Amino acid sequence: MQKSIYIILIACLTLIASPTNVKAQQVIGLNEAIKTALKNSYDIQLVENSLAIAKNNNDLGVAGALPTVSATANDNKTNSTLQQQYTDPTRNTTKSGVDGTNVTAGLTASVVIFNGYRIMATKDRLAALEKQNRSLLEAQLQNTTSLVMQQYFNVIRQQAYLKTIEKSIEASTQRLDIVKTKQQIGVANEADLLQSNLDLNALLQAKQNQLLIIDQAKADLLNTMVLPTSTLITIQDTITIDAKLKLAEVEAKMKLNPTLQSAEQLININQFIEKETRALTYPTLRANTGYNFTSSQSAAGFSLLNENYGPFVGINLSVPLYAGGASKKSIKNAQINTSRAKIQYQSAEQDMSTALYKTFQTYQNNLQQTPIEIANYSMSQSLLQLVLQKYQLGQATMVDVKQAQQSFETAGFRLISLRYTAKIAEIELKRLSNQLTF
């Protein structure tokens, strides 16, 4: 009866974990997960918007290199009192309610000829800002790809843990069957039966907890993919590791890391700001041209109509003489910002180099341990089967079985952990050296 109950429990748990439970589950691969995340990611969309703004601003007009053209027009009506006095008093005039109209219109074009090369520096800065935003987008693409890969392989890791637990459940079920058989022939006591039941129950609970961990790991992946967490997905994959990475190669490619390149571009941006600020101390020469029209009409007075119209051309020169020392302070502040950007770059490079070195050590160490752990896992499987056989023959104790079972579980978990840690280190090394593909 008890055996039937445990079989039913195991069947129910299997049904819960089954991909065909309630709704059909979508089988998803790594490439599909990455493509979906890159397409839907809010973080990527925000960076793309910043890049679009920087691209729009990278223009000669924004930099001030193109002429500015403006048009003006005014039409004023007046009603006034006219009083005129002449040397001949008989010509004196005083008149109220005199209507008048004043019309002015003009078209003006202006272009900067020289302003201390500020326009060139501004255009270079805008181009550098666009380039920096492209690097930031590349960095976000790399980061999102890395996160998806880590979460994807975490699901695989948790599923592998589940398989180890299920194999241990099979061993516990086999042990329980042996105890029941021994009890029937009078060579096993009630304590052995109770202990076997307790051990099996503990594993069944562990399986249920592991199913929850898997569901939550999938929810994290779905969140990064910007899909509803209720989406049912199945991942049928294994952890394969690229064991060919070399420290010298990834260190050489670290210079290509977009985050590091963005920090380097910030130095250039601040250097261009320095040039823009310094240009404020130079004279500004501007050429102006246009066309003006003025018309003045009056119902009375000496002049009933007066009109002027025609083109004009001119040169405007502005020379900054004194501004309270503000220009010098602005230049000094710009130089400080450039120095700070250089320090930030050096700090980022140092941190990244250290992280790369430590990650490579982890990667190499786990690769070196993996063959030994594979052998340990294989031996633990053989040991468990051997001890179960001996226990059935009365040549081993329940303690021996439990120890063999614990060794099997530990070896299984350790092997999975080694592979996962090595894979995560590989992903991080490729991210740091800008080698992740998407």
Model-predicted regions and their roles:
Residues M1-T36, Y86-P89, L211-E249, K430-F438:
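Terminal intrinsically disordered/low-complexity segments used for targeting and assembly
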Residues V22-S70, N74, T229-Q271, P320-L321, ...:
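Bacterial Sec-pathway N-terminal export signals of envelope proteins
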Residues Q25-Q26, T72-T108, Q236-A243, K275, ...:
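Small/polar, glycine/serine/threonine/aspartate-rich low-complexity segments that form flexible
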Residues E32, N56, N143-M254, T362, ...:
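Periplasmic alpha-helical coiled-coil/stalk elements that build and connect Gram-negative outer-membrane
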Residues Q45-N49, V62, I113-L141, A191, ...:
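Sec/SRP-type N-terminal targeting helices
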Residues Q205-L227, S378-Q435:
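Short segments within alpha-helical structural elements
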